[in-house]
Amino acid sequence: MAEAKGKTDTRRGYFDVDGSGAMTELIFMLELSGPMAAFESDLIDGFNDMIARLREERSDLLVWLYEEAGKCMDFNTRVPITEDSALIEQGCFTRLSTLAEEYRRAHPEEFIHQDNVRGSGCLFDVGGCIHMAQQVYQTALPEDRPMRTMVIIVTDNTKIESESGDYWTPDRLRELVEQQEKEAGWEFVFLGTSINAKQVAEDVGIPAKNAATFACDAAGVRENFASLGVMILEFSATGVVVPTWAQKISEHLAKTQSGRS
């Protein structure tokens, strides 16, 4: 493995709290509940390959990882990228879906309202995750905060409800996102399939330039993480999201669409 190029952040916070010297925090929210379920292994392999490549270049990254399938979630928070828990275990999403279905069969009364009203709006679950990270950030001393934070959302959910009865309405989510962008300098990235990702992103306060629609096939799922890895390296070094970060994702989508026409 090549020597990591990341500089150690000598501020007291991260060096003393977890020994990672982390300067950049990456918050991944990965949802697999719809058409991408057939490509679970590609998502996991693509994500793990990205983490492995990032490790070769930088050791100063912290990873939050939220995995969701069938409204069942698992997560790790503030994991140094060098630790095994920054990776996803094979079969993770299948396990979550199975647990969710078992709970649903045992407690059907809890899902009546969701089935009739809520739909499958992925971003409402995202709101809770962002709020959790926000609370950690706000309660930390300034020297205990990362220099940069990026929130990366990858979903195959195709329905965004505006009248759901859920706390996280689009307006509330947009307020939360814009607050973190303005007050803390966070960057948000949104990748979605079978939806207009740029429009959905803008509806909740994420800049369209930080969003892309991807092809729901094995190559498209893997390309997400190949492109994200390159973009993350640039962001961790400069704090800038390059405008062309999603070019290969969009090119593959266009190729698959032209093949179907």
What do the PLM-derived regions correspond to, one by one?
Residues 1-261:
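Acidic, low-complexity intrinsically disordered regions
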